[in-house]
């Protein structure tokens, strides 16, 4: 399995050049993309130009960063100067940002290579990537199934091998759930640990950029590159940068892992339940202490999340009016122009969420819905704080089900929203979460396990995930077409 850390060694030892590696991944991408369709745009020329610079640095004997020369890809709601940032929407189909997101600046400092921008649910609103207005991305394990969402392109690209790593964004599970569906690692950092400057907003108090990778070590390496305080983001957490690779220790002895009974109730797929119970047994054998915890207010998390997220989306997406940038539909007057632009530019799910968000913020409903949801959010955060005073981590399924067929939930928004039931609490509480592969279903679809930690507890999270990965190599999953020939 091609990983960042293994390929870095090959580059440093001159077993392969950065140009050869980049060309190999581009060639592999050409084979899998006709089926997977993870990408919305390509940047091969820029990638090869950077690869040449990396090779020149190696030839001179210069030290290179772990990400230097390793081909990755970026979710299409993260701004890269002079490259499209469509958010998979007709509204921004022709938008090209004049600046880089802060995470891109940091990746450039590491001589990263991006092969292009990745598909997603429109404006990150969805859990299957079916809401993209520009492409249909398939799950690399079964082309008839969804890759999850909203970072479906990111998870599908890494799983299929058309990128060694990727960036996604997570508002209510949009990194972790597709990682679970595609059998890869997806990390949502603590809110504020990674700058949101240059991330096109869905819900600003919930959004967080994070890595999608093939193993836990790679997740730590990408997090090293993108995390840390950024003066351009007012919600960025101050403090010294952390080397997360120091946390990759194969040891969970005496670690207290909480298992919340509320996440194992009705609606949990029996095969998912079995895989997670086996994961719990693995941790017991490794010396961790398993503790039952209770998060009773988590049953309100999904309702509170959708009220808060849609209210913020309604506000954030008000800027797309056909005046400043993005799509513009001609009309006789300003009001008609704005109305037609928004009607034709936004897809059905985005329109639904704007409508609901505007409703909960309207006079007479603000107190009944939005204010109440904010109070529930505080209760959920307090519950997590209390739980983490007793345990080091919390273990749950990432999603209640494995991937499903295209169209299966497209006409039932509530059924799709319920796929986020295990992931949204972490966003409401602002805590870090990671999804790692925990097995396969009888229909040969990946199952993900989620670990949650206290705010800025990524190191413990990564240690526990790494230890599980080392103990269960059977859970490191690569689809039949996912291996790159080097």
Regions found by a protein language model. Give the residues of each.
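Structural helix-boundary/capping segments
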Residues: 31, 109, 160-165, 171-266, ...
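Serine-dependent amide/ester hydrolase catalytic core
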Residues: 8-9, 263, 298, 319-428, ...
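An N-terminal boundary/leader segment
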Residues: 1-52, 285-287, 477-486
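Immediate post-signal peptide segment of exported/extracytoplasmic ligand-binding proteins
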Residues: 54-70, 248-260
């Amino acid at each position: 399995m091609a990983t960042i850390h293994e390929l870095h060694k090959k580059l440093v030892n001159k077993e392969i050049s950065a140009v050869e590696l980049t060309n190999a991944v581009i060639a592999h991408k050409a084979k899998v993309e006709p089926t997977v369709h993870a990408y919305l745009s390509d940047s091969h020329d820029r990638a090869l130009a950077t690869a040449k610079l990396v090779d020149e640095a190696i030839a001179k004997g210069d030290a290179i960063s772990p990400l230097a020369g390793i081909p990755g890809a970026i979710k299409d709601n993260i701004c890269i100067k002079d490259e499209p940032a469509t958010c998979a929407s007709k509204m921004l189909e022709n938008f090209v940002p004049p600046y880089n997101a802060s995470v891109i600046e940091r990746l450039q400092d590491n001589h990263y290579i991006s092969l292009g921008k990745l598909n997603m649910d429109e404006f990150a609103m969805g859990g299957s990537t079916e809401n993209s207005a520009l492409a249909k991305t398939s799950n690399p394990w079964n082309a008839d199934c969804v890759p999850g969402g909203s970072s479906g392109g990111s998870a599908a690209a890494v799983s299929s091998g058309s990128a060694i790593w990727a960036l996604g964004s997570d508002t209510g599970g949009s990194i972790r759930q597709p990682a679970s569906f595609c059998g890869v690692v997806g990390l949502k950092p603590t809110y504020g640990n990674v700058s949101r400057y240059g991330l096109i907003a869905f819900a600003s108090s919930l959004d967080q950029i994070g890595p999608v990778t093939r193993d836990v070590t790679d997740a730590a390496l990408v997090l090293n590159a993108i995390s840390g305080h950024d003066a351009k983001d007012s919600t960025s957490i101050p403090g010294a940068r952390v080397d997360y690779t120091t946390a990759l220790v194969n040891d969970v002895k005496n670690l207290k892992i909480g298992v919340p009974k509320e996440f194992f109730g009705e609606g949990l797929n029996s095969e998912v339940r079995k895989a997670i119970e086996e994961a719990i047994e693995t941790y017991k054998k490794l010396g961790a202490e398993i503790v039952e915890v209770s998060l009773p207010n988590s049953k309100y998390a999904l309702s509170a999340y959708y009220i808060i997220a849609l209210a913020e989306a309604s506000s954030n997406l008000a800027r797309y009016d056909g005046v400043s940038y993005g799509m513009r539909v001609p009309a006789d007057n300003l009001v008609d122009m704005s109305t037609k632009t928004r009607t034709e530019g936004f897809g059905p799910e985005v329109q639904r969420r704007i409508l609901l968000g505007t409703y909960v913020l309207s006079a007479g409903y603000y107190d009944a819905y939005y204010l109440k949801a904010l109070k529930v959010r505080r209760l959920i955060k307090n519950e997590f704080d209390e739980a983490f005073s007793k345990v080091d981590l919390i273990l749950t399924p990432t999603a209640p089900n494995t991937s499903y067929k295209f169209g299966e939930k497209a006409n039932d928004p509530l059924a799709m929203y319920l796929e986020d039931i295990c992931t949204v609490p972490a966003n409401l509480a602002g805590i870090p979460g990671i999804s790692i592969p925990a097995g396969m279903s009888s229909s040969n679809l990946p199952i993900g396990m989620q670990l949650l930690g206290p705010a800025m507890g990524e190191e413990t999270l990564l240690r526990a995930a790494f230890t599980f990965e080392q103990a269960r190599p059977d859970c490191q999953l690569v689809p039949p077409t996912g291996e790159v020939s080097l």
